[in-house]
Swiss-Prot record:
Species per Swiss-Prot/TrEMBL record: Bifidobacterium longum (strain NCC 2705)
Keywords: Acyltransferase, Cytoplasm, Iron, Metal-binding, Transferase, tRNA processing
Family membership: Belongs to the KAE1 / TsaD family.
Class of this enzyme: transferase
Localization per Swiss-Prot or TrEMBL: Cytoplasm
Cellular component annotations (GO), alphabetically ordered: cytoplasm
GO molecular function: iron ion binding; N(6)-L-threonylcarbamoyladenine synthase activity
A Pfam family this chain is assigned to: TsaD
Protein name per its UniProtKB record: tRNA N6-adenosine threonylcarbamoyltransferase
Length: 347
């Protein structure tokens, strides 16, 4: 069988994206973001995002085909993010993808957007080893997964009990007065600060709580501790050392993620850790994971920055996995699922 060619379409939040992947080769990757339209509101406004998807859908898909020097007839299947995400945004992408699939008589796969974040690493590092661990870190998800057989069997090893890592960063960013999105600002300032200047707690790593939740995450306490420290310094009339706050926060969160990921690798006898999600673009986290991986003898696979944030390549790559595994396409009338569980790879 020749390598499958899949058109991937993404519209879960504020990026409209389309890409074409053949096997493990990325042929095109087009992204249109409405982020600037949301910045004035301090977060994504679903109605604005949905309208932006409707406007960008056809141009993105058309450019992806042109860039790959293909027509829709050359594509073997279409994959589209069916969840999790904002319902209105998902509806635009899924409706458009269904129309294309019907018009071109192509099979369609409604895929799990979050699993796509780890699938995309194959474009850079090749196929998944069997029985590997995966760390997903994004604005809405922080989870450790056991990927026994991609894409057929994926289990959740640990997950966040409250705020995800990205949410923690966004909330602290607002506290420090950074514009939306705040994560990149914390990353940039953190590179110039002292990571040990401020004592930031490491949730669920010690005592009974740590023993009871060896692979779970909790970052709400981190956010609260940083907020209280900043407020106390402001009350005392002290200037806030923004770079140090950012560096200390990033170091704490990155250390927790790296420790628990390595513990999971040891427990499941895996010498490979797959990392994905928008938060994996954070420079401190990338450095910490690579450092821990070297110390533990674990091959840490983190995709290049442009493949960390939402894109069509990750959707197309997961679509390729499903086609190769012989998984049946989704029904033509499959629904969106804004709360799609991580154990469900496709609809």
């Amino acid at each position: 069988m020749s390598e499958p060619v899949v058109l991937g379409i993404e519209s879960t939040c504020d990026e409209t994206a389309a890409a074409i992947v053949r096997g493990r080769e990325l042929l095109s990757n087009v992204v249109a973001s409405s982020m600037e339209e949301h910045a004035r509101y301090g977060g994504v406004i679903p109605e604005i995002a949905s309208r932006a998807h409707a406007e960008a859908f056809v141009p993105c898909v058309s450019k992806a085909l042109v860039d790959a020097n293909m027509t829709l007839a050359d594509v073997d299947a279409i994959a589209v993010s069916a969840g999790p995400g904002l319902a209105g945004c998902l509806a635009v992408g899924v409706s458009g993808a269904k129309a294309l699939a019907w018009a071109a008589n192509k099979p369609i796969y409604g895929i799990n957007h979050v699993i796509g974040h780890i699938a995309v690493t194959q474009l850079q590092f090749g196929p998944f080893p069997k029985d590997t661990l995966a760390l997903i870190v994004s604005g809405g998800h922080t989870s450790l997964l056991h990927v026994e057989d991609m894409p057929r069997k994926i289990d959740v090893v640990g997950t966040t009990l409250d705020d995800a890592a990205g949410e923690c960063f966004d909330k602290v960013a607002r506290l420090l007065g950074f514009p939306y999105p705040g994560g990149p600002h914390i990353d940039r300032h953190g590179q110039n600060g002292d990571p040990h200047a401020i004592k930031v707690p490491m949730g669920l790593t010690q005592g009974k709580a740590g023993a009871a939740h060896p692979y779970d995450f909790s970052f709400s306490g981190v956010k609260t501790a940083v907020a209280r420290w900043v407020e106390s310094e402001q009350a005392a009339g002290h200037e806030i050392p923004v770079d140090d706050v950012c560096a200390s926060l990033a170091d704490s969160v990155a250390t927790v993620l790296a420790r628990k990921a390595m513990r999971g690798c040891r427990q499941y006898d895996s010498n490979t850790l797959i990392v994905g999600g928008g938060f994996s673009a954070n420079s401190q986290l990338r450095a910490k994971l690579l450092e821990f991986g070297e110390n533990y003898g674990v091959d840490v696979r983190i995709p290049q920055i442009k493949l960390c944030t939402d894109n069509g390549a990750m959707v197309a790559m997961l679509g390729v996995n499903l086609v190769e595994a012989g998984v049946a396409p989704s029904a033509p009338d499959f629904p969106i699922d804004s709360a799609m569980p991580l154990t469900k790879v496709s609809m």
